[in-house]
Amino acid sequence: VGRVEAWSAERPALYDMTIRLKDKKGDVVEVVGAKIGFRTSEVKDGQLKVNGKPVVIKGVNRHEHDGRTGQYVSREIMERDIQLMLQNNINTVRTSHYPDDIYWYELCDRYGLYVIDEANNESHAQGYGDESLAKDERWIGAFKYRCNNMVQRDKNYPSIIIWSLGNECGNGICMEEAYKMVKDFDN
């Protein structure tokens, strides 16, 4: 890859990528295309930065839900949601409380919305007490499995600047191990 323009919410620069799979004879047997972007995100000296520049989060939570169709959210509704967010100067959306349909990330990449991608780890009833699932070693595998599925599926969307390990899970060994796993993959 040569010189590229970095992706950001202000300038969502995307590039076309094409992958060609060839057999042993050199014949193309499969072609896959995708839009990709290039950016960095980090927390440095207590400040979130994208491409080395400070970012102020102006965000909302979004559930994949429609008042008329329930958990089925059409592409048209997703596009309407994006437009409403942009019209209201929103620059970040959290996928509450589970990873969203991949089309949502494609829209965020295209229109320039930062994403906090949230794994479907949740344990409201147990929260932060001694009985929290996050403190029970028997649940480490489940926490890590859900986080890994999210990261592996969504790792190539430049709009994702933060991985959320879950919602109201409490703290404990399960969250610590999931954090280490995600950090080892995307540091």
Sequence positions of predicted segments:
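Solvent-exposed loop/turn segments at secondary-structure junctions
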Residues: 99-101, 121-123, 167-171
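Secreted/periplasmic carbohydrate-active enzymes, especially glycoside hydrolases
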Residues: 1-107, 111-115, 146, 161-162, ...
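Conserved short-loop catalytic and cofactor-binding motifs
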Residues: 66, 96, 131, 135, ...
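Active-site neighborhood of glycoside hydrolase catalytic domains
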Residues: 110, 134-187
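Aromatic- and acidic-residue-enriched carbohydrate-binding clefts of CAZyme catalytic domains
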Residues: 58-63, 71, 118-155
